Each structure stands twice: as structure tokens, then as C-alpha cells.
A protein has these predicted regions:
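Solenoid-like repeat scaffolds
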Residues: 325, 514-521, 552
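Well-ordered alpha-helical scaffold segments within catalytic/enzyme domains
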Residues: 298-307, 334-350, 431-448, 495-505, ...
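Short, solvent-exposed loop/turn segments at the edges of secondary structure
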Residues: 27, 140, 217-222, 294, ...
Length: 660
């Protein structure tokens, strides 16, 4: 059946990029029309809705105000604008959209997955009758072969895998979940095209997993294909990988700098976003295919950094509100995902729809008498768990994996820097503070002023309480728990407070100094917040060092071991059961545009933006950074004793605050 991006709301919202090439162009008015037939729309008649000329600079999330749309119908819309430099525009092209078979007042629309035909980057004969096909990059897909047989050979063996060992596909990945599959293929006489039937894996098709849609079929991740027992000529056109992914615009973003290693890391992480989008929602990789909030948060920011695409993140977020996962901090991260969605799109409909689900995820119900939250003091009542849609207890995670699990030896350290878990956890409480701040912003955006005032008061009081509880004034940094419980200090117990503005006045450098003593003592997940913390503290040089270092706890190590998608962990030895296709390891895809190049929205929908490049020792950098209002293109030179201003062209109807 035909697949299309169905509009699922009876009152959708419209966005457009304001035309005009003159510097300083701003929209001053707009007019939107919606018709139920192409003829009316083409003639400038909105027989369902005509907004009239609206004096406004709003060009994102303009809500349809006509009669409710009907399910299963096609509609047509167009817009014209007035700007301060070019006056009234012509009508835009007529754009069509079709509604879903079932509509509600609000439901997120999304694109269907697509297939891209990809041909080999190279074919090598290993020995007579066996060829190794390399597609150049790992991807989730299906294999289509066109093979010939004279009838004397009735079958071949097809091997698919992600990794090579000794010039052959790795057949025994050990404890890891690096993928390998073997498929016998019976040949018919003559030349025929065969589609390899991918079988379901019990590990990633269970009740908690997101399943591939029937119109696509099952997929596996593979870069390499070996065809064994085939002696006829094999051309690149006869070996096709149909790669499955969410629609992706390769031209929407770019980055290059004077550091070639950093450029390679950007390429790895940008590609990882496309490659891991195969399910149409963000998941944790191929091993489980389950959405988790932490994966979704990092993936969301990375996707915003590499493509002008927002629906997949919103769909993933709304799925997780109904299907939350067990870590305490990840329940709290629902607030971050919701806020970033609003900040990057300017569309508050998801916030409105989800508001009552977001409030309990601040975890006020877990507040103890001392004002801190705890998951271990008996406060996880049935009512509380129902309020956050959880079927079991939640537990603090800090980072993952912990010591002695998932293939690690009993005494082999995990990724939490030896964090001392106690009843009152500095990391969990830092996330609680962040959630309070975000809930204040969400309530304010929705006009719920009493709630906004409440959360503002709570966050102000909680910041003081957090510092009193966890900051060791004598040492100048935070401990993992209360002084009565532990004096252990970890990277995590300090990087999260630094990232969330919880460090006491005048003590930021002390905390940064401590963080630098810990190195990359966190997982690829934790690295997102380490990088955020360092750039928040304006420690760009150390941040650049961490981005570009080359030991086995680095993004470069992912390239060195042979992966073309970001790994689940820094190396197999740090998580022996890891995937080689995990977008939560792709943090540079958002850290580079958001932090190094310094482009972030200050107000919802990029109505105002901050451009604050922190190049450190890079000689130069240039980037194209997507936003919902259009692309920001930047060129920055970094010369000693020479003032070289940022050169950038940016979207219209937009204000920018530049920092040098």
C-alpha cells in the first residue's frame, strides 16, 4: 500500500521559511489559506480557511483555525508574507497534504521509513568462488542479489556482517552483539533476482521492542557481504543493499575545520543519526530495539544538529511518556526532551497535550523530609508509579554499565567513576533541579502562571538545598552523597551540577579543575553532559581535547576499530555486549553545532538565537546549521593577535546575539 506522511490532527499547524535575500529582512505580516481542492488554492481562495493578513513575525507553528479537517482527505495550502525590505511576496507554491484515517485534536505526524538503493564501494575476490562485498558503511537494510546459474550449482552461501577479522566477515563476535548472519540461497537455472529473507531475532522483537512495519519488512545492520560458492562474474549492479532509514537531507548540515580528526568524528556522528533512524523512532540500537529516554534525548539533539527534522524526536518522546524506562534520571529527562522540542520548533501543542504527564515526572512525590528526592526510602507508592506510567520500581543509574555486569568481570569497573550510591544521590537530585527549572518554563509557555511561579520558587530553594547537601566547601567540589553517607567524589557528581548551573558562585573553576583530573571517566552517554558542562564553563580548550583525543575512550577509537556508526560504548572491553550501531554515542553531532560553533535557540522556534563560537585552538571552522526557520551558515577564523569577526548568513525573521 502507498505510504505517506499523514496529518493526524484535525487542526494542524503550518510553518514556512521567510523569503528574501536582503540583509536584515524580517517578516511583518502573513496570510495563510487552506482549501479542499487544488483549483481554489491555486486561485488564492481558501474555501476552508483564510487567515487574512495577520500583522506578525510568526512563521512557525501557525495554527489552522478553520473547521475541523476530515479524515482520509487531501487538502491544499499556501502562504504569502510581507517583509520590511521586499514588501508583499507572491503566493508560495501550492502544497498538498493528506489526513490520516483517524484524527484527533492533536497527534504527531511523522514520515514513513524509506529505502535507499546502495551499491558496493568495492568487491574483492577472497579466493575462487568467494567474494567479499564492502558497502563502505554499516547500515540497516536488506540485500538483493542478481545471480546466474547454469543449473550445475544449486546454491550459494550469503554471509552478512558488520565487522571484519583477518579480511573475512567476523563470524563469532563473542559476547558482543556485533551482527553476523548466514543465509543459504538456492539458485534457479538462468539469471534471477533474489531478495534475502531476513529472519526475526527474538532478542529485538519482544513485547517491549518497536517492530519493523510490514511495508518494509525485517532488516539487519551490515556493511559487508560474502558470497560463497559463486564463480560467475559479479558486478556491483548485481549486489544491492536496500538501506532503510527515516527521510534525511544530507545537505541540511555541514562542518569542516582545521582539525581533520574532528572532521572525521563529525562525519561519523552525522551518519550515525541517519543510519540508526530505521525504526522511525529513536531506539537503543539493534540488540533490543527499545526506546529509552537517555538515547532519545541525545538522539534528539544530534538530529537537530544535522537535519531540519523534528517529528521523529517528538514521536519518540510521546511514545516514552506512555512507555517509560526504569532509570530515575531518565524519567526526569522527559522534561528536557519536551523543552528542547518546544525550543527548537516553537510548537507548544505537544507540551499542551502532555502537560499532566510531565508534571509527575519532576518526581516531587519522591521528596523526603530533608527536601531531597530518593528512590530508596519507601516513597514509590502505587499511585506514584501509576502517575509516571511505570509498572515497576525506578532505580538511580548515574551512568551505564555499572561494575561487574553485561560481560564485565565482577571487579571490572563500570562507567560511573566509582560513584557511591546512597539514599540521596547528587546526580539524581541535580536532574531533579533541572526538571524543576524546565517545568517552570513549560508552565510559563502554556500560560499556567501559578504553576510557573510555584516551580520557580521550588527551583530557587532547591538550588540552595542542593549546594548545602552535596558541596564540600573545604575541597571545592561536590561529593556523590550527603557528608554523613560518603566523602567520595566522582566525575558524574560534578559534571551534572556544572552543566545545570548548580555550582556555588566563585567555585566553578574548582569544579572544572576536579573534572579535569577524572578524564573521560564516563560512558558515551555521560560524555554528552561532560561536554555540555565544559562548554557551559567556557573551558573550550579542554573540551576540544576531549573531543579529539585518540586513546581507547574516544570517538576516534570508534573509527579506528572499524565502525562507521557510533558505538554503544568506547570499546568492546568497556561493554562486552555492546552494539556497533548506537546513536547515544554520537554526541559530537550536537556538541559541534551547539557548543563548539555555539548556535543555540534563545527563544522558542529560533525566534532569537545565540551564536557563541568556542573554537579553542582550532585555526578555523565553517558550518551549516539547520533550524526550523532556515540554515545558519558560519565561517570563523581564529588568528592570534588578529581580530577576525564571525562571518555568517542566517535565516530571515530572526535575531542573533553574537559573542566573540
Amino acid at each position: 500500500p502507498l505510504q505517506y506522511a499523514a496529518i493526524r490532527s484535525s487542526h494542524p499547524a503550518f510553518s514556512w521559511i521567510v523569503p528574501g535575500e536582503t540583509g536584515g529582512t524580517r517578516q511583518t505580516a502573513y496570510r495563510v489559506i487552506v482549501a479542499d481542492n487544488h483549483e481554489d488554492a491555486a486561485s488564492g481562495r481558501g474555501n476552508l480557511w483564510d487567515s487574512g493578513v495577520v500583522g506578525s513575525d510568526q512563521s512557525v507553528a501557525v495554527r489552522y483555525a478553520g473547521e475541523a479537517l476530515k479524515p482520509g482527505k487531501s487538502y491544499f495550502w499556501r502562504v504569502k508574507t510581507v517583509t520590511n525590505t521586499e514588501g508583499e511576496s507572491e503566493w508560495s507554491e501550492v502544497k498538498a497534504f493528506r489526513t490520516a484515517d483517524r484524527l484527533s485534536e492533536y497527534e504527531t505526524a511523522y514520515y514513513p521509513q524509506v529505502k535507499t538503493m546502495e551499491f558496493p564501494a568495492g568487491i574483492t575476490e577472497i579466493h575462487p568462488g568467494t567474494r567479499l562485498v564492502d558497502f563502505g558503511k554499516d547500515a540497516f537494510g536488506q540485500l538483493v542479489l542478481t545471480l546466474a546459474s547454469d543449473g550445475t550449482r544449486d546454491s550459494v552461501i550469503v554471509h552478512l556482517g558488520e565487522c571484519l577479522e583477518g579480511g573475512r566477515i567476523l563470524r563469532d563476535p563473542g559476547k558482543s552483539t556485533i551482527r553476523y548472519h548466514r543465509y543459504p540461497l538456492a539458485l534457479l537455472k538462468g539469471t534471477h533476482t533474489y531478495r534475502i529473507k531476513i529472519g526475526k531475532d527474538k532478542r529485538n522483537t519482544g513485547s517491549a521492542a518497536v517492530l519493523m512495519p510490514a511495508y518494509v519488512g525485517e532488516v539487519v545492520p551490515f556493511r559487508y557481504c560474502e558470497i560463497e560458492g559463486y564463480e560467475a562474474p559479479l558486478s556491483p549492479a548485481s549486489v544491492v543493499r536496500e538501506t532503510v532509514h527515516y527521510p534525511f537531507d544530507e545537505t541540511a548540515s555541514s562542518f569542516r575545520s582545521s582539525n581533520e580528526l574532528l572532521n572525521q568524528i563529525w562525519d561519523l556522528c552525522k551518519y550515525s543519526v541517519r543510519a540508526t533512524s530505521f525504526l522511525g523512532v529513536y531506539v537503543d540500537g539493534d540488540r533490543e530495539r527499545i526506546p529509552y529516554e537517555a538515547d532519545a534525548l541525545i538522539n534528539q539533539l544530534c538530529h537537530y544538529g544535522v537535519d531540519r527534522e523534528y517529528a521523529i524526536a517528538r514521536r519518540s518522546h510521546e511514545y516514552l511518556l506512555q512507555h517509560p524506562t526504569w532509570p530515575t534520571e531518565w524519567i526526569l529527562q522527559a522534561l528536557s526532551i519536551a523543552w528542547y522540542d518546544y525550543l527548537y520548533t516553537g510548537d507548544s501543542r505537544s507540551l499542551e497535550s502532555s502537560y499532566e504527564l510531565l508534571k509527575p515526572r519532576v518526581l516531587m512525590a519522591l521528596r523526603e523530609k530533608n527536601g531531597l528526592i530518593s528512590t530508596t526510602t519507601g516513597l514509590q507508592t502505587d499511585d506514584f508509579l501509576r502517575s509516571i506510567r511505570m509498572k515497576g520500581q525506578i532505580r538511580d543509574i548515574v551512568d551505564w554499565p555499572h561494575t561487574g555486569i553485561l560481560g564485565l568481570g565482577k571487579k571490572q569497573g563500570g562507567e560511573d567513576d566509582g560513584f557511591a550510591f546512597t539514599d540521596y544521590n547528587a546526580v539524581t537530585n541535580a536532574w531533579h533541579y533541572e526538571a524543576l527549572k524546565l517545568m517552570e518554563g513549560i508552565a510559563g509557555a502554556l500560560g499556567k502562571q501559578d504553576d510557573a511561579t510555584f516551580y520557580a520558587s521550588e527551583s530557587d530553594a532547591f538550588k540552595k538545598r542542593f549546594i548545602r547537601s552535596f558541596f564540600n566547601a573545604r575541597k571545592g567540589y561536590f561529593t556523590d552523597g550527603l557528608a554523613s553517607d560518603t566523602d567520595h567524589a566522582s566525575l558524574h557528581g560534578n559534571m551534572f551540577p556544572l552543566a545545570f548551573d548548580l555550582v556555588p558562585a566563585g567555585k566553578k573553576q574548582n569544579v572544572v579543575d576536579f573534572i579535569q583530573t577524572r578524564g573521560m571517566a564516563c560512558s558515551v552517554y555521560g560524555s554528552q553532559f561532560l561536554m555540555d558542562a565544559l562548554y557551559e564553563a567556557n573551558d573550550a580548550e579542554y573540551a576540544l581535547h576531549m573531543l579529539t583525543k585518540t586513546d581507547d575512550r574516544s570517538w576516534y577509537n570508534m573509527i579506528r576499530v572499524g565502525s562507521t556508526i557510533s558505538l554503544e560504548a568506547w570499546d568492546n572491553k568497556y561493554k562486552p555486549n555492546q552494539d556497533w550501531n548506537h546513536a547515544w554515542g554520537a554526541a559530537p553531532a550536537n556538541i559541534i553545532p551547539r557548543r563548539l560553533m555555539g548556535v543555540e535557540p534563545l527563544t522558542p522556534g529560533f525566534a532569537t538565537a545565540r551564536i557563541k563560537p568556542q573554537l579553542a585552538s582550532l585555526e578555523w571552522a565553517e558550518a551549516t546549521i539547520p533550524t526550523i526557520r532556515g540554515a545558519i551558515r558560519m565561517e570563523v577564523e581564529n588568528k592570534v593577535d588578529t581580530y577576525v569577526p564571525v562571518s555568517y548568513t542566517h535565516l530571515r525573521a530572526h535575531e542573533t546575539s553574537a559573542h566573540l
